Amino acid sequence: MSLQRTGEHHIPIDADVVPSIGVDISNLPLDKTKTVQIKEVGGAMMPLWPTYLKGAAALMYVVDISDAYQLAASATAFHHLCGLPAMRDKRVLLVWNKTDAPCALRDAETAAFDAARAETALKDALTTIQVSALDGSNAEQVMTWIRGVYGV
């Protein structure tokens, strides 16, 4: 992601994204003076997730809704995270990714994820956004949410 002279973000889109395995750390510019560090922690690192949450300002949880086989596992991990003490008073963004994929799950199928249950656990600190990794649809909404977390 890069900040253009106009102040708008250019978000490069990679349609051949694979799941994270370890930890990927990126710096994300929010404006001309503020940059935040984003830590993408893969599912294989699940036992260490609570450690990363302790110092986090918020949680962004990305679900690949083109992968029906992983939805139940993603939901289980997400609900576990939402119940951790380290999540107390943290804002959470649930990102439904790859919504434009031909095999993307529809609303009736993603209802099994039970995001409403997480809203109760998080005391309404949950925001949900649907995005496309292919064309970048709604990526700016994600940036707006991140800026809101940091007061930018």
Give the location of each predicted region:
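TRAFAC-class small GTPase G-domain
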Residues: 1-152
